[in-house]
Amino acid sequence: MAVASFCFLAMFKALNKFQYRPGDWKLLLLMSLAEPCLYFIFEAMALQHTSAAQAGMVTAILPPLAAALAFIFLKERVSGVAMLGFLIAFVGLVWLSLAAEKNAHASNPILGNALELAAMVCSAVYCVCLKKLSERYSPVPLTALQAFSGAVFFLPLALIQDAPEFTLGPSLAAILFLGIFVTLGAYLLYNIAIARMALSKATIFSNLIPVYTIIFAYWLLDESLTSNQLAACGLILSGVALGQSRRVKTPVANIAVIPD
């Protein structure tokens, strides 16, 4: 978060054009609290109890969950087929957790997957707030607000924790990668997509996370999934795919122009 914050300070010209509108502090606060603050707490706790591969599969619940919240708060229409897809994906999530086996990478997969689900709820709340705010603000200052609020929120927590042992070179490279390419780059692109597309269509791309997570967990962490877990993964993805079909189109509201 701190690395991304310093990068955003270099974009002072774009941030200087941020024009706060009275009353928006509630949405801005809720957006920042949901993600990155609570989201990353639940995410970090989840990965202490479940494997990266299983946590990645739980993220497949985000699109139908975001669609449900968009229906409630943004009045985006969701078909019965989409709701059926959400139910199927949730059943797959429960199956994935129950079929999980304890191992070196997943000491308590049921708890870990439940915490990951809580992280997805936070992410869905964040998406709804961002979509609403993008009608009035550019994605650049909204993403910068995420970075700044995350840095302020996590700094006291970092100071009270014991300093971890790390090798300077690889650890510094990992920190810079996360700060520049994830917190700044990935979030900025994701926020631009949410601002320019219907929320249900933008979040569908998060379905790629489980695929990449499983590939890299197998490649880098030597993790594996049982046949039951693989079947549950297929059920989750099937439910998510069904949830994206036949959704009634709604016009996307005008968004703020991204400053040069």
What are these regions (language model features)?
Residues 4-8, 29, 69, 78-100, ...:
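Hydrophobic transmembrane alpha-helices of multi-pass small-molecule transport proteins
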Residues 49, 75-77, 136, 193-196, ...:
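Helix-loop interface residues and adjacent transmembrane-helix termini in multi-pass membrane transporters
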Residues 54-57, 80-83, 141-145, 201-204, ...:
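Signature of the 12-TM Major Facilitator Superfamily
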Residues 10-19, 43, 63-87, 211-231:
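C-terminal transmembrane-helix exit sites in multi-pass transporters
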Residues 11, 29-49, 68-69, 95, ...:
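Hydrophobic alpha-helical transmembrane segments of multi-pass membrane transport proteins
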Residues 23-32, 78-90, 137-146:
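Cytoplasmic-side transmembrane-helix entry/capping segments in multi-pass membrane proteins
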Residues 14-16, 74-75, 96-101, 160-162, ...:
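Short helix-capping/hinge motifs at transmembrane helix termini and TM-loop junctions
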Residues 5-8, 66-68, 72, 104-161, ...:
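Transmembrane alpha-helical segments that form core, pore/gating elements
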